[in-house]
């Protein structure tokens, strides 16, 4: 992969003799991302092997450049407005939105993106526009490795996870709660303006629901798979 050189980093893990994450730096300055597009298949193959890729030194200085970088991979866009995620986020471009609008002191733990909904993206791209002076790390975990270890230690539990799945419950406010990591309003989450439209959308998704005081809406998903195997 002549466009990129591999680079080791602190705390890099190795699983089945592969680095996690794989760290790539351009071998020369890129004026645009045409070369990335040309090497898309090779990069996606590396992603399937390593589980995550960290790109450094690619000249991504703002949301527009990040949008161009993501577009170079030729992947179908997953618009946030069409998702059922309950995080408050702002679109910066059609493909780029903020990770979360919650205050800095709200801790967000490891999770699969939108796994608590029937709609979720296949791939995720993250970009750090401004590095934090202190902290600010984004932790990563190889789910396949975690699953293998859980199967070895708690096989019956994993069997039950496969068998039963899980139902997720949450409460959505009538107006976005900017102080919460999960404060997206039911209007924005469901893409509706009225209670009647919200109930129709929830029924189409096989959700259960009940209305609460102050225009809040409590919902519970149908049983969703706890373990999925996706293609590369």
Language-model regions: role of each:
Residues 1-232:
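Non-heme Fe(II) oxygenase catalytic core, chiefly the N-lobe of the double-stranded beta-helix
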